[in-house]
Amino acid sequence: MAELNFKAIEEKWQKRWLEAKIFEPNIRDKPKEKKFYITVAFPYLSGHLHVGHARTYTIPDVIARFKRMQGYNVLFPMAWHITGSPIVGIAERIKNRDPKTIWIYRDVYKVPEEILWTFEDPINIVKYFMKAAKETFIRAGFSVDWSREFYTTSLFPPFSKFIEWQFWKLKEKGYIVKGAHRVRWDPVVGTPLGDHDLMEGEDVPILDYIIIKFELRENGEVIYLPAATLRPETVYGVTNMWVNPNATYVKAKVRRKDKEETWIVSKEAAYKLSFQDREIEVIEEFKGEKLIGKYVRNPVSGDEVIILPAEFVDPDNATGVVMSVPAHAPFDHVALEDLKRETEILEKYDIDPRIVENITYISLIKLEGYGDFPAVEEVNKLGIKSQKDKEKLEQATKTIYKAEYHKGIFKVPPYEGKPVQEVKEAIAKEMLEKGIAEIMYEFAEKNVISRFGNRAVIKIIHDQWFIDYGNPEWKEKARKALERMKILPETRRAQFEAIIDWLDKKACARKIGLGTPLPWDPEWVIESLSDSTIYMAYYTISRHINKLRQEGKLDPEKLTPEFFDYIFLEEFSEDKEKELEKKTGIPAEIIHEMKEEFEYWYPLDWRCSGKDLIPNHLTFFIFNHVAIFREEHWPKGIAVNGFGTLEGQKMSKSKGNVLNFIDAIEENGADVVRLYIMSLAEHDSDFDWRRKEVGKLRKQIERFYELISQFAEYEVKGNVELKDIDRWMLHRLNKAIKETTNALEEFRTRTAVQWAFYSIMNDLRWYLRRTEGRDDEAKRYVLRTLADVWVRLMAPFTPHICEELWEKLGGEGFVSLAKWPEPVEEWWNETIEAEEEFIRSVMEDIKEIIEVAKIENAKRAYIYTAEDWKWKVAEVVSEKRDFKSSMEELMKDSEIRKHGKEVAKIVQKLIKERTFDVKRINEEKALREAKEFMEKELGIEIIINPTEDKGGKKKQAMPLKPAIFIE
């Protein structure tokens, strides 16, 4: 057969689908009970989609196609997300001729150079990638209703008015507040940063450090050395301070509110603190070595402690000053031990080594399983020798901190006898109230980079608009919705619950970037994670909006909150529709149809997205729906999918390790790409794209096409006389239908592919071997029937090839709209399946015996099937499942009693091997019917149950495990 031209077939059917508009559902076609509404997170248009995205979008398309074939009225729409600063940042970097950005867009995304330079205008980036993304989705065969397409921001005014309405609603309900809050901030551009505004570090948490002000007195001046800690309760155990002798520190005037103090912190810390409600005036810069050997006073205990050198202190983390608590901090203990050994370091700073030798550890926490100094014990236990054992030190630190926090009891008055969890909060609160400590916000990691290419800081913003996800009543409604929702996989539910619990105020607007202006404060632009939470409702009316827009009959400015209130929140009212017609210019009957569409399609059945969006978009999606819509319109389910890697490596456009979705289609064909990514892993697991494996799958799809094309030529006649092997094939086909259907209902795409493609292919291969030489009506009937079912089962995965084959089969209309196969009751035959499995097993056993025993020129196989009484034993053991009750039951049978000792051995064997699911079959009949096939396959004579007991094997025969002798 000539090589299959995937591209030609795909283009043919994509054209026909679009012309016939078969994916544009009409609410008049089916009752609401038969509607199915599924959406997926619309793509952000800052570049080409890669094969990781292909997974995210193919899963819902497969499900949409499956449900459509099941007879549902399916809505699967698509739109484009362009809100926020990333696109503006890209334009800025291209304008500045940033080499890395230019390389990504020219060499990785393959943007022609003459087009690339137009990207200095962000609108041109949007236009280019919007067109490319739509082409990719069409080329992928996605069954999208393109009549509902739109894009975000004020560049598409109707949607922008919808977002304005959403925000007025949130504000009315008290869910939008103004105030001060910590945010990620681009210090160069001067804007808050949401998750989508970051190039790196979107998952990096913000830590609340307590900075404790240790006093350093010089010439009568009080100077504070603020030590940053996440364990304020350990301030009672400080034995010394650490600074990095090689780092640059500053002495600075720090003004906060009406208070002014002099601090010494690292140069990096001074910069960061200037964004956190502090005015910093640097007086002096110097190296940390200047501080070594000086003493500071602990503001809590009053103890004077020495400042010691430590290169492990990172000046770019918090204040660059660390308090040492060696009894409870493994790093501190090991650093002191290193100093004791390396006295030359101390001598360099004129510190008497005896000072370090005489440092006394202070025990603060009683911890079961440890003595007074848990850090010392853990270091010794792990065999840590020096600060170079960094991995082990981090392990020890995690172990001690976790154990002390959860199980530790404080030993120092006035908190003696209280749990560490409680003491930690109390001590922090007390120090903050007394003014001897403050809070500094810091990232847990350094790699938090904005889309503008700048390193982010944490800033306290005043007069910022926030969505108050911390509102207790709102949280309760979100929990209620989550309880009612299906979450796939179910294991992700706990993550949603935790996020609802800790979610707090979220900055919802920026001063720069693309988006919708905040309606009551238009200097602010609504950010990308805030205008993408309820657009699934807009999809339901966007078809009508788009049509009016194309006809020039829509004035977006007249789409007021009153209009959206009626469509999405109120009851049907003819009077209201007439009133809105006057106000909007939209005919009352169109307004009525819009409301009908919303009421028909809502609630949303499934929301699909990647697992990275659980902490933000997907949880915000729940919150915003429960805030705005009636309970009957709350979403019903969320399906979360895993990530993709490329040849075992994480995909990264900055490293060039990325495969564009469109390139994968060009290289392999859409159906090959679709089937490959669906077959690799279940929807919730990660997958790895390997080019070599894709090539193998292409050949298998070509074989599928070849087989169906061949079977399509067979004419089907009724009343054919089927043989057992024919019935076996139909039974297996039934099983494939059932298992594929069950898997797709639960989004288990890999399992579905295993049954719909690989299982049928393997069963067919066996069937063709078993029926080789036959060309009768029964075989033709089975193969033609199989072709009809198989093409429909594969249609959600490989729609283009299946449309072509459906046409060859003479199927009515599009296979995309054909009836999904259902099991045929009369095809079920568990007995025949068991018999066929038995034949396979016996053949494998014969091959194994010949191979293991190294029998050359084997001529005959003598097969002895189990006697009837052994079947009775197996059946009783299957029912009773334990030795005593099985033997009691069996000994009631006089025939079985004759074999007493042998019965006991068999029962023990069956129980040990847990052989409980034994279905009786006529082994001899099955073997005799397959005798000719077995002889041909094995190349030896098969003799079944001869009277002669060859090799004394007969007594070894067990149910489903006959005795075999080879000569």
UniProtKB/Swiss-Prot annotation:
Q: What is its EC number?
A: 6.1.1.4
Q: What family is it from?
A: Belongs to the class-I aminoacyl-tRNA synthetase family.
| Protein localization | Cytoplasm
* Recorded catalytic activity of this chain's protein: tRNA(Leu) + L-leucine + ATP = L-leucyl-tRNA(Leu) + AMP + diphosphate
**CDD domains linked:** Anticodon_Ia_Leu_AEc, LeuRS_core
Superkingdom of the source? Archaea
Name the UniProt record assigns to this protein: Leucine--tRNA ligase
Extent of motif 'KMSKS' region: 650-654
HAMAP family from the UniProt entry = Leu_tRNA_synth_A
Q: A single GO BP annotation from the record?
A: leucyl-tRNA aminoacylation
Q: Where does ATP bind?
A: 653
A GO cellular component annotation here is: cytoplasm
**Keyword annotations for this protein?**
Aminoacyl-tRNA synthetase, ATP-binding, Cytoplasm, Ligase, Nucleotide-binding, Protein biosynthesis
Q: Where is this motif: 'HIGH' region?
A: 43-53
**Gene3D superfamilies tied to this protein:** Class I aminoacyl-tRNA synthetases (RS), HUPs, Isoleucyl-tRNA Synthetase, Domain 1, leucyl-tRNA synthetase, Valyl/Leucyl/Isoleucyl-tRNA synthetase, editing domain
Would I find Cytoplasm among this entry's keywords? yes
Name a GO molecular-function annotation: ATP binding
Q: Which NCBIfam families match?
A: leuS_arch, PRK12300.1
Species of origin: Pyrococcus horikoshii (strain ATCC 700860 / DSM 12428 / JCM 9974 / NBRC 100139 / OT-3)
Q: Name one Pfam family in it.
A: tRNA-synt_1
Q: Which PANTHER family match?
A: LEUCINE--TRNA LIGASE, CYTOPLASMIC, LEUCYL-TRNA SYNTHETASE
